[in-house]
Amino acid sequence: MTAWRAGVRRGALAGLSTFLTLVLAGPVYAGAGRFSTADAPPTDKIVADVVSVNGSGCPAGTATVTVLEDHTAFRVTYHDFIAVAGGGSQPTDLRKNCQLGLLIHVPQGFTFAIASADYRGRARLAAGATGLQRTNYYFQGSPDDTFVDHPLAGPLRAVWHTTDVTPVAQLVFAPCGVFRNLNINTELRVNAGTVAPGVVSSMSMRSTDGDIDTIFHFSWKTCP
C-alpha cells in the first residue's frame, strides 16, 4: 500500500515539485536515469570531495558521497542520522542536522545543476507523534533560503521516500570554469506529541536501517 502527500515548499523556488511516498511493503527506488537532462553526462572522470561536515546528524566519518558510474547522479549515505523523541530521550535528540560541503570536480567544458533529489529513511512514530525531513542545497555564494519540508504523522512504522524536482526553467548551474562548493543541509525532527509522550518515536536516514540513501540527480550543460 502506498500513500502520497505533498510536502511544504518554502523560499525562492516556489515551483519546486515535491512528493512523499510511504513504502509499507518494501522500499521503492527511483532510478537515476528517469529525469531528463539538457546535455548528455560527460564521460570523463567525475570526483566528489567532501570538504566539510558539520552537524549532530553526521559525526565525523559517518557520511559518504559516491558518484554513480553513469555520471547521472551522486549518492549520499548517512550512517548515524536519527532523531528521537519520547521515552528517555534528551532534548538534543529531537532535532538532528547534517551540513555537507561538496566540491564536485567535473571535466573541462561542462557544468551542472541539481535537477532532483530522492531521499529515503525510516519512520517509527507513535500515535500523536510527528516527524519532519527538511533539506536545502545551494552553491557557495548563492542564496540559501530555499528549503523543502516533508512532514509525517503517527502512528506510522514504514520506510519513507521523498522526492524534490526543480523545474527546468529554475535550474541553478554552477558557474563555468569556477569551483564552487555545493552545500547540502538536511534536518530530521521528531515531536512525541501529547497522546503517548512516554513512547519512543524516531525518524532516521541511516544505512543501518536497510537500503537507505539519498540520490542527487545532475542536469548537465556544456559551457560556451
Over which residues does each language-model region extend?
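Secretory targeting and sorting signals
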Residues: T2-A30
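N-terminal leader/pro-regions and domain N-caps
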Residues: G31-G87
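A short, structured loop/turn motif at beta-sheet edges
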Residues: E69-T72, H105-F112, A126-G128, F139-D145, ...
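Cysteine-clustered segments with highest specificity for TGF-beta superfamily mature ligands
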Residues: R75-T77, R157-S201
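Beta-strand elements of well-folded, non-transmembrane domains
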Residues: D80-I82, L100, I104-Q108, D118-A127, ...
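Short, solvent-exposed beta-strand/turn "edge" segments of beta-rich domains on protein surfaces
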Residues: G86-R95, I104-A113, R124-A126
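An exposed acidic His-Trp-rich patch
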Residues: A115-P167
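Proprotein-processing/basic-patch segments
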Residues: V190-P224
